[in-house]
Amino acid sequence: MQSPLDRRSGLHAAIIMDGNGRWARARGLPRGAGHRAGVKAIQQVAEAAPALGIGTLTLYAFSSDNWRRPAEEVGGLMRLLRAYLRGETERLARSGTRLTVIGRRNRLPAGIPEAIARAEAATEAGDRLNLRIAVDYSSRDAILAAAARLGPEGLSRDAMSEALCGPGDVDLLIRTGGEKRLSDFLLWEAAYAELHFTERMWPDFGAADLAAAVADFSARDRRFGGLNPPLLTAAA
């Protein structure tokens, strides 16, 4: 069995950041207050990730299905995204964090795709953490788009993995807020991910919670569909 440190080397962690609205409701606050608190949680978790051996952190910020939410809430989320890009890019670059946004950009409000491109260019040299934020993202749509690009002749498991996985398969997938579903997030990339569900709402999720999730991951025995050597010997 690998040591916890070895198993955390270059870890790709992904988080479904759920519970902002319920966090706000429990405090008698509007949903927007929960989303604003959620941005602060992003900052804390991204800062803590490298020390825990996480090389890539993918965060589910806005799904393609989230366009169905009330226009006022969607507008607030887009303003938060714009403010995050404007206010955090320089700090991310200084800290060695490379920012990448995945998902569709052609439906985002005017100016945001350009702000994303500027932030990605400004942080491109970052080698401490690869921070990926999923916006207007659907894993099923991403798989279909990749298959269309590859075409019948180019379609294979390896080619699809290369087209989708970018920094590699997800090792640890965390969902906050108590729900236990994947919600169309990284379905191909998380095929063998270890799942960690927590009741904690996203705005309350911090460095200690991330460390606990990584410790839980490190204690697991990942077999990727096979058997451990002792079991193979016993079965022979």
Spell out what each predicted region is.
Residues 1-236:
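Flexible, compositionally biased loop and terminal segments
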